[in-house]
A protein has these predicted regions:
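Acidic, metal/cofactor-coordinating or nucleic-acid-engaging core segments within structured domains
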Residues: 185-238
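Short, well-ordered beta-to-alpha junction loops that form the rim of enzyme active sites
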Residues: 145-148, 248
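Gly/serine-rich nucleotide phosphate-binding loop at the start of the catalytic core
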Residues: 1-138
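A short acidic-Thr-Gly-centered motif at the start of a beta-strand
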Residues: 124-139, 152-154, 231-238
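SIR2/sirtuin-family catalytic core signature
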Residues: 1-3, 227-308
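Short, flexible loop segments at the rims of nucleotide/cofactor-binding pockets, characterized by
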Residues: 116-124, 219-226, 249-250
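Short, charged, surface-exposed secondary-structure boundary motifs
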Residues: 171-181, 281-284, 308
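Conserved catalytic core of sirtuin-type NAD+-dependent deacylases
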Residues: 1-45, 52, 141-144, 156-172, ...
Length: 308
């Protein structure tokens, strides 16, 4: 299924290009193909550009959302305040600047709405089961980061045995899809900077610092809140003795879920991590260390072993 974050970018490029351009601009990705149509026709140039864009933001999209070009935002603010040439210093401008930054950066509120629209147009009618033991499986529990209803519709797994931790599609999931970074420290950092600027009566800095914090709040995914809201599912897992993880990159944003999962299940549980590439293998090794699993309690295996 075409459900990677790069597939999401392709969707935005086709159906919401203005939003995509605005968002990528926040991460120093310029839309040069708009300036010269020849770039779209030259596949080599386009492939090199796509590779650069992928590495800059989309390879680890959720983490990347918390790494906007803050320096550019701050420089932009400074140039505006300097152009005002205020005799009495940067005071009496906060409301005007707040309104301006809101107009500039509020667009990002539409991100999760576009995620929902993208997932709703993913078609499953050509999908076929790849693992027979999943079909009509009412013994295992499925903890999925995938927004689609493939487990419910293709494998016919009971909905009460599935947790779409980041939301999904109605009627299989009541919560809409969400994504975001997990860097709460960035938000706190800029709120503190805004407070200090306010104490120094520098309304220009106060305004832009709050604007940066607002941007990060709108792209933030509260993992603690996600887990607390779905506590009923986690409380069912006390007797789980085996955990198998496949198709996950073990990104920093989502590691708290696995830490909490370890807390909820049997202390003697065995873990299997399946990898597709050498990069996945290294990520699994890092996850094992972070989870503090003993050598005899886990295996790291090629993904082919899972599907056999």
């Amino acid at each position: 299924m075409k459900t990677s974050y790069w597939d999401f970018r392709k969707y935005l490029e086709k159906y919401a290009e203005d939003f995509l351009v605005q968002m990528e601009n926040m991460y120093s990705i310029a839309p040069f193909e708009r300036l010269d149509k020849r770039f779209k026709k030259n596949k080599n140039i386009q492939n090199r550009r796509d590779d650069a864009i992928y590495k800059t933001l989309w390879k680890n999209f959720e983490y990347g959302l918390g790494e906007a070009n803050e320096a550019e935002m701050l420089d932009f603010s400074k140039s505006i305040v300097d152009d005002l040439d205020l005799d009495g210093g940067p005071v009496g401008i906060k409301d005007t600047m707040d309104d301006y930054w809101e107009e500039q950066y509020r667009f990002i509120e539409g991100l999760n709405e576009y995620v929902g629209k993208w997932i709703r147009q993913v078609r499953l009618f050509k999908a076929a089961p790849m693992k027979a033991t999943f079909i009509d499986n009412s013994e295992d529990y499925f903890f999925t980061f995938n927004y689609t209803s493939v487990l419910e519709r293709i494998y016919r797994v009971p909905s009460n045995h599935i947790l779409h931790i980041h939301g999904g599609l109605y009627p299989y999931c009541d919560e809409p899809p969400i994504l975001g970074h997990g860097n709460v420290k960035k938000i706190e950092e800029y709120r503190e900077k805004a407070e200090r600027a306010a104490e120094e009566y520098d309304e220009g800095k106060e305004s832009i610092y709050n604007a940066v914090a607002n941007y990060y709040e709108r792209t933030f995914k509260n993992t603690n809140e996600c887990m607390a809201f779905r506590g009923k599912f986690f409380r069912q897992l006390t007797g789980v003795n085996n955990v198998e993880i496949i198709g996950h990159s073990f990104g920093e944003v989502n590691m708290p879920y696995f830490t909490y999962l370890k807390y909820c299940i049997s202390k003697n549980a065995k873990w299997k991590f399946y990898y597709h590439s050498s990069e996945d293998y290294n990520a699994a090794e890092k996850a094992v260390k972070e989870l503090e699993l003993d050598i005899g309690d886990y295996e790291i295996l090629p993904s082919d072993c899972f599907w056999q």
